[in-house]
Amino acid sequence: MDPVLLPTLFDVLDLLASKAGPVTLDDLNVARRVTSRRFAEIGRVLEGFQVAERKDFSLVPSVNFQQFVECWEVAGVARLDCINAFFRHYRPYDNFLCFLETQKHIEVPPRQDSEARHNLGAELKEKVGLTFVAVDTFKWWGMAVAQVYLSHIGDRNIHWGGARPDIGAFENSLLRHYAQVKPLDGFANIAQLADRVCRELNIAFVRFESLFEQLCFQEPRRYVTATSLARLPTSKSPVQTILPRSKAKQIADNLRLGKPVEWTEKRLMEDGVFVGRRNVKMVRILLEVTNEQQ
């Protein structure tokens, strides 16, 4: 297993898309310093994705590469699903997702419990041939492409998040948990709702956001959203998703800091979701909508 971090992989993918010729270690070192051994590991992973080939100590695009670049620019969650399809050609990552889908979640012991973490690593090695370090890397890969949900509100486990429920099943789950969180003045915290719904339906947070936005647009009178300065005080749940290539590069150009491009968007679940361009943290769901409200 070659646990390569996403920023490094996407630096190389960007170089492959930008250069007319092969990408070498010297090319990559302009943006991010890596060793020759790490460059070889990157090559093995990208060959696994079926988007690049190793040739004379360099990397060249495969016949599938242009399709990957097109995936990279697709809007919404469809972009993540498309990229994940390439990721899954890489056997160790696919083994991780298959195991997670079967188990539904992986219980991760706290850092101070070294014995329990060692035992988990031994179990993972035996069952799926992966080290603890590999799983710790792949959980971020999976989150970035809407296949993993990392809970920091309900628990701290790695949850399968690759399910694709229809809008009806999503709404039923949302309504059930809305009734259970006992909202103040009718307004429930969206992060708390998301944690419950994501764990029940086995969906990633970004898919929750997409389906929630869809409901808000379909039934704007029923789903009343609000902004709030309040954040859940006891949790800090990171969310990251792969940005479209053009958007990531535009953000980097606007900042002009001379730093590597940030290929993923990073935020906190507690900061709510976007409905259109509006960031909302609270929702009130009207169980009955009168003709006047419609």
Which residue ranges define each predicted feature?
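Donor-sugar nucleotide-binding helix/loop cap in glycosyltransferases
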Residues: 1-216
